[in-house]
């Protein structure tokens, strides 16, 4: 029989409805200060999970990656802060940049092309297109 070790924490809710998430849990889940989390309820349970803007807009992200691959024939990989969202035709040589929203890194883009000024500008453009989508959604 396999036993899974679970950590149970008892916390009080303050007058504003806030709950402190223990440092150990935040560290284990790699939750950083000012990072968004998603709270859902299921019967008598409250579930807290990390929120990924990129994962929740997978179809939009996928279409951008497919267009870049189809038009430019570039391999592309888009990740949130923890996992790969989409990867098309990766190769050995790539350049990458962060996807920034409200001064917070929400992900990274890798494009599998040579590193030069024009390609860096193209990569930053794609990053801004993706992050600007969240400003208006």
Which residues does each predicted region cover?
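Short beta-strand-centered segments at strand-helix junctions
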Residues: 16-29
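Short, structured interface segments
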Residues: 32-53
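Short hydrophobic alpha-helical segments used for membrane anchoring or interfacial signaling
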Residues: 39-41, 75-83
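Short hydrophobic beta-strand segments that form the core of ligand-binding sensory/regulatory domains
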Residues: 46-50, 98-99, 105-114
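Amphipathic coiled-coil signal-relay and dimerization helices
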Residues: 47-49, 83-90
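Juxtadomain coupling helices with adjacent low-complexity linkers
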Residues: 61-65, 106-108, 112-137
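Short regulatory alpha-helical segment in sensory/regulatory domains of signaling proteins that mediates
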Residues: 65-72
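A short beta-strand signature within small-molecule sensing/ligand-binding domains used
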Residues: 91-100
């Amino acid at each position: 029989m396999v036993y899974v070790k679970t950590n149970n924490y008892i916390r009080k809710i303050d007058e504003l409805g806030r709950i402190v998430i223990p440092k150990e849990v935040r560290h284990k889940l790699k939750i950083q200060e000012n990072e968004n989390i998603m709270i859902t309820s299921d019967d008598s349970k409250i579930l807290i999970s990390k929120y990924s803007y990129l994962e929740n807009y997978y179809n939009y992200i996928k279409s951008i990656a497919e267009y870049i691959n189809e038009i430019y024939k570039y391999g592309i990989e888009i990740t949130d802060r923890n996992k790969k969202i989409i990867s098309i035709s990766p190769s050995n040589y790539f350049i990458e940049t962060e996807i920034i929203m409200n001064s917070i890194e929400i992900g990274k883009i890798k494009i599998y092309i040579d590193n030069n000024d024009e390609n860096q500008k193209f990569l930053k453009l794609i990053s801004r297109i993706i992050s600007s989508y969240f400003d208006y959604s």
